[in-house]
Amino acid sequence: MAKEPTRVRRRERKNIVSGVAHVAASFNNTMITITDAQGNTISWSSAGAMGFKGSRKSTPYAAQVAAEDAARKASEHGMRTLEVEVSGPGSGRESALRALQAAGFTVTSIRDVTSIPHNGCRPRKRRRV
């Protein structure tokens, strides 16, 4: 007897007009998470999730593709305006922001929330190349 095929349930549309885009740009990858005002995740994407591997993940183009993907998923839920919080030293910061604006979102504010230690933990040893 053949098993019935499992039905794929489509996510319900959330109808959230404004939200916050968190762009975490490290030296190795760029992650974009779009949340509502309370911090509940609406959509997310990263350079690695878009199929880039190794050193290609850290490129501005990979960040742009990831931001376009996260923006497309968020706009399916009816999102129109965004506040952008950028953190980290990576090369994908500006290109991710530009891609979010090009996707048709109105960016109301841009904040840099990169954490800077006030002499906290001891840093790892310097790389000698």
From Swiss-Prot:
Coiled coil: none annotated. One of its GO terms (biological process) is translation. Disulfide bonds: none annotated. GO terms for molecular function: rRNA binding; structural constituent of ribosome. It holds the Pfam family Ribosomal_S11. GO terms for cellular component: ribonucleoprotein complex; ribosome. Keywords: Ribonucleoprotein, Ribosomal protein, RNA-binding, rRNA-binding. Part of the 30S ribosomal subunit. Interacts with proteins S7 and S18. Binds to IF-3. PANTHER family: 40S RIBOSOMAL PROTEIN S14/30S RIBOSOMAL PROTEIN S11. Belongs to the universal ribosomal protein uS11 family. NCBIfam families: PRK05309.1, uS11_bact. Located on the platform of the 30S subunit, it bridges several disparate RNA helices of the 16S rRNA. Forms part of the Shine-Dalgarno cleft in the 70S ribosome. This is Small ribosomal subunit protein uS11. The lineage of its organism: Bacteria, Pseudomonadati, Pseudomonadota, Alphaproteobacteria, Hyphomicrobiales. The gene is rpsK.
